[in-house]
């Protein structure tokens, strides 16, 4: 049984999902859970992208033990230097360098020749090897590359010291039988293939990322790059949970180190921190994945779950909670439930989360897992409060012009503003904008119920942009949806100020 290495790129390619902007603490929390999940490699980020990205990767490299910690770098010395500076304190560092190899990318994007690309790839791998014994090389857009050139460049980078060669379907163009055949032919034609592992990285533009990954695996790929919940650019990447459970359920002859009972926790954590909801009918981790509405199906499942369920929910860690949390629940019960849901908070954050839980319990008769996840995901999002909401009053109704009065503190100084608007939320946002003189544009606002019932928590999401087009996302929850909307707006503004300043 051959070992299959799981390379998780949730924190790099997954974070490139439109609207996702994880901070340093959120990235670390996800990385710690990925280590519990027992992935083999965590691609922590792209250090050259920004100072914040560099610090987040460095933080993970220093604090997360177990998996190999990889950092992405273009095939240029400046990127490779920065990648190494970020991951050099990891127990097991890897530099992952890449360059495009398809003619359309070489000619239209890089403005180079094949020979120049080959030379740059070899130079990059040799340069990375000066720092790190473990170097991965990716041929961007490999699927649309000339096969003979692909063989030539892979042979050259292996000769230069690459320990892993990665074959990406960058635009999600391949069909499963084509992609499997490509991997088989590469393994047969690369003369020094015994000196490196073959990896694949599939995108989901045609909905085939998981199928293509599995086809590659059965044709000899030894590493698969994937993300939790299939996050990623455009239509996303191959979903880690789908690949792993397909191998487990169908008993394919590959050894996978993933602790499947951590899958559900990891999925929920990533969804809560990124703000990207899991579609209800998502395979493995969707809310409806183990739901049965048909009477015939329900009868069968009651008699024997295996009639319609090929996976035992407990296998992926879906908790069977017998504990109902409410206002009489203690901290130990609360902490135990957090751990079952995949959260491990330091004492100070646990105290604050428990305090907020008690406040919510006074307003709601029964606290659900979704309530807890909403509370804690907000707790993890540690952003300095340059602006803090001190007072909020809204007057609205039929025949009344919606009016918001707010008091915001900035460096100890209180700012009071009053504004009218086209509805209570609009009035609140106009009042905040008037008080907080930070250039920005409101790109998106949404409000949803976290749970059912009239006492449900409402979650507000606000997306802002600065003058350079950078996106900042704020989220907040409250049983008062107007309060949640105001807090979400301020959190997005605080994130903007933290990263860009006030100008």
UniProtKB/Swiss-Prot annotation:
Looking at the keywords, is Metal-binding present?
Answer: yes
What is the protein's major site of localization? cytoplasm
Reactions listed under catalytic activity: 3-methyl-2-oxobutanoate + acetyl-CoA + H2O = (2S)-2-isopropylmalate + CoA + H(+)
Protein name per Swiss-Prot or TrEMBL: 2-isopropylmalate synthase
Give cofactor(s), names only. Answer: Mn(2+)
Question: Where is this protein localized, as stated in its record?
Answer: Cytoplasm
Q: From what superkingdom does this record's organism come?
A: Bacteria
State whether it acts alone or in a complex, and with which partners, per the record: Homodimer.
What SMART domains does the record tag this protein with? LeuA_dimer (SM00917)
What is a single cellular component term in the Gene Ontology annotation? cytoplasm
Entry's family note: Belongs to the alpha-IPM synthase/homocitrate synthase family. LeuA type 1 subfamily.
Higher taxonomy:
Bacteria, Pseudomonadati, Dictyoglomota, Dictyoglomia, Dictyoglomales
Q: Name one GO biological process term.
A: L-leucine biosynthetic process
User: Where is the segment annotated Regulatory domain?
Assistant: 388-503
Where is each Pyruvate carboxyltransferase domain found?
A: 4-264
Q: Name the InterPro entries on file.
A: 2-IPM_HCS-like, 2-isopropylmalate_synth_dimer, AIPM/Hcit_synth_CS, Aldolase_TIM, LeuA/HCS_post-cat, LeuA_allosteric_dom_sf, LeuA_bact_synth, PYR_CT
Report the PROSITE patterns cross-referenced here.
Answer: AIPM_HOMOCIT_SYNTH_1, AIPM_HOMOCIT_SYNTH_2, PYR_CT
Function as written in the Swiss-Prot or TrEMBL entry: Catalyzes the condensation of the acetyl group of acetyl-CoA with 3-methyl-2-oxobutanoate (2-ketoisovalerate) to form 3-carboxy-3-hydroxy-4-methylpentanoate (2-isopropylmalate).
TM helices/strands, residue ranges: none
């Amino acid at each position: 049984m051959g070992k299959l290495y799981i390379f998780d790129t949730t924190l790099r390619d997954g974070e490139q999902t439109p609207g996702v902007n994880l901070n340093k603490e959120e990235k670390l929390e996800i990385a710690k859970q990925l280590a519990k999940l027992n992935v083999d490699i965590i691609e922590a980020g792209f250090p050259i992208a920004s100072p914040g990205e560099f610090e987040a990767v460095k933080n993970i490299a220093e604090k997360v033990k177990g998996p190999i910690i990889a950092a992405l770098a273009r095939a240029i010395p400046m990127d490779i230097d920065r990648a190494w500076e970020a991951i050099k304190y990891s127990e097991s560092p890897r530099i992952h360098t890449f360059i495009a190899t398809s003619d359309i990318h070489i000619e239209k994007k890089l403005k180079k020749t094949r020979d120049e690309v080959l030379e740059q790839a070899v130079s990059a791998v040799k340069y990375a090897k000066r720092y790190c014994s473990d170097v991965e090389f990716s041929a961007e857009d490999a699927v649309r590359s000339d096969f003979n050139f692909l063989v030539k460049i892979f042979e050259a980078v292996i000769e230069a010291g690459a320990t892993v060669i990665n074959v990406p379907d960058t635009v999600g163009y391949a069909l499963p039988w084509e992609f499997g055949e490509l991997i088989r032919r590469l393994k047969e034609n690369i003369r020094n293939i015994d000196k490196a592992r073959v990896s694949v990285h599939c995108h989901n533009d045609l909905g085939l990322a998981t199928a293509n990954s599995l086809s590659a695996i059965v044709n000899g790929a030894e590493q698969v790059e994937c993300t939790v919940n299939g996050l990623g650019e455009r239509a996303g990447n191959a979903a880690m949970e789908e690949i792993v459970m397909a191998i487990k359920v169908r008993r394919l002859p590959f050894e996978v180190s993933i602790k499947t009972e951590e899958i559900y926790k990891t999925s929920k954590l990533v969804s809560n921190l990124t703000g990207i909801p899991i579609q209800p009918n998502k395979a493995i981790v969707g809310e409806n994945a183990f739901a049965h509405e048909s009477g015939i199906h329900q009868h069968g499942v009651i008699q024997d779950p295996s009639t319609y369920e090929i996976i035992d929910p407990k296998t992926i860690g879906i908790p069977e909670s017998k504990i109902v949390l409410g206002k009489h629940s203690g901290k130990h019960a609360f902490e135990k439930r957090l751990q079952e849901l995949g959260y491990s908070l330091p004492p100070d954050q646990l105290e604050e989360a428990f305090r907020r839980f008690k406040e919510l319990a006074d307003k709601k008769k029964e606290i659900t897992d979704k309530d807890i996840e909403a509370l804690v995901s907000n707790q993890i999002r540690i952003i300095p409060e340059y602006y803090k909401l001190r007072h909020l009053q809204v007057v609205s109704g039929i025949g009344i012009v919606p009016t918001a009065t707010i008091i915001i503190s900035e460096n100890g100084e209180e700012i009071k503003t009053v504004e009218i608007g086209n509805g209570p939320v609009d009035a609140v946002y106009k009042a905040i904008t008037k008080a907080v003189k930070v250039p920005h544009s409101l790109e998106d606002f949404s409000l949803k119920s976290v749970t059912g019932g009239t006492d449900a928590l409402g979650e507000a999401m606000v997306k802002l942009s600065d003058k350079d087009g950078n996106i900042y996302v704020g989220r907040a929850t409250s049983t008062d949806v107007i309060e949640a909307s105001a807090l979400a707006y301020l959190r997005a503004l605080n994130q903007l100020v933290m990263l860009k300043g006030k100008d």
